[in-house]
UniProtKB/Swiss-Prot annotation:
GO MF assignments: ribonuclease T2 activity; RNA binding
Organism: Petunia hybrida (Petunia)
Reaction catalysed by this enzyme: a ribonucleotidyl-ribonucleotide-RNA + H2O = a 3'-end 3'-phospho-ribonucleotide-RNA + a 5'-end dephospho-ribonucleoside-RNA + H(+)
Glycosylation sites: 50
A GO cellular-component term linked to this record: extracellular region
Compartment(s) where it occurs, according to its Swiss-Prot or TrEMBL record: Secreted, Extracellular space
Protein name as annotated: Ribonuclease S-3
SUPFAM superfamilies with a match to the protein in the record: Ribonuclease Rh-like (SSF55895)
Gene coding for it: S3
Gene Ontology process terms (BP): RNA catabolic process
Length: 222
């Protein structure tokens, strides 16, 4: 109960942040599909059966902001309850739990590369809480399944995009694909975009890693 109260207090603090002008145009919340990311299976020490956070990226309309000036990542302490919450939403799949929670390599990388670029709006803890809050509002796996897109099946770019747009107020997501097997395009990540205040969805700039033609089927790896 005490842990839940602490987490609730974190979110109350996040919502009470004073508005400040942003130096970026929108956020992209990037969610990774573990079955694709972890292929072949020995690539990951741990994995999830649902989408997990890759990062929350402040972006300009024409380019991504990276490695901005500011204080570098400070590791969260073991007794800090945010680690337990991050472990559920932002899994460091390439590392075992002990190493991941102690060294925090993915969280450090993402904050130093992207999070610092929105420091005028969100400090380190607020940045991570924001990413988790945004993910909590989405259930992309259920959304895809509702539209017949289930793990192990293939669909066109348009079919996947149309399904995701039903939960983004019709704003384009950024579908990100890889070829783990030559000639087989598969869905690796989904980017969902928001205004700097994270109060509304926004349109994502396409990264153009997927074949968007109607003749190509994209694998949603099972």
């Amino acid at each position: 109960m005490f842990r839940l109260q602490l987490i609730s207090a974190f979110f109350i603090l996040l919502f009470s942040l004073s508005p400040v002008s942003a130096n970026f145009d929108y956020f992209q919340l990037v969610l990774t599909w573990p079955a694709s990311f972890c292929y072949p299976k020995n690539k990951c020490q741990r994995r999830s059966n649902n989408f997990t956070i890759h990062g929350l990226w402040p972006e300009k309309k024409r380019f991504r902001l990276e490695f901005c000036t500011g204080d570098k990542y400070k590791r969260f302490l073991e007794e800090d309850n945010i680690i337990n919450v991050l472990e559920r939403h932002w899994i460091q799949m390439r590392f075992d739990e002990t190493y991941a929670n102690t060294k925090q390599p993915l969280w450090e990388h993402e904050y130093n590369r992207h999070g610092i670029c929105c420091k005028n709006l969100y400090d380190q803890k607020a940045y991570f809480l924001l990413a988790m809050r945004l993910k909590d509002k989405l259930d992309l796996l259920t959304t895809l399944r509702t539209h017949g897109i289930t793990p192990g099946t293939k669909h066109t770019f348009g079919e996947i995009q149309k399904a995701i747009k039903t939960v983004t107020s019709n704003n384009d997501p950024d579908l990100k694909c890889v070829e783990n097997i030559k000639g087989v395009m598969e869905l690796n990540e989904i980017g969902i975009c928001y205004t700097p205040a994270a109060d509304r969805f926004d349109r994502c700039r396409h990264s153009n890693t997927c074949d968007e033609t109607s003749s190509t089927k994209i694998l949603f790896r099972g």
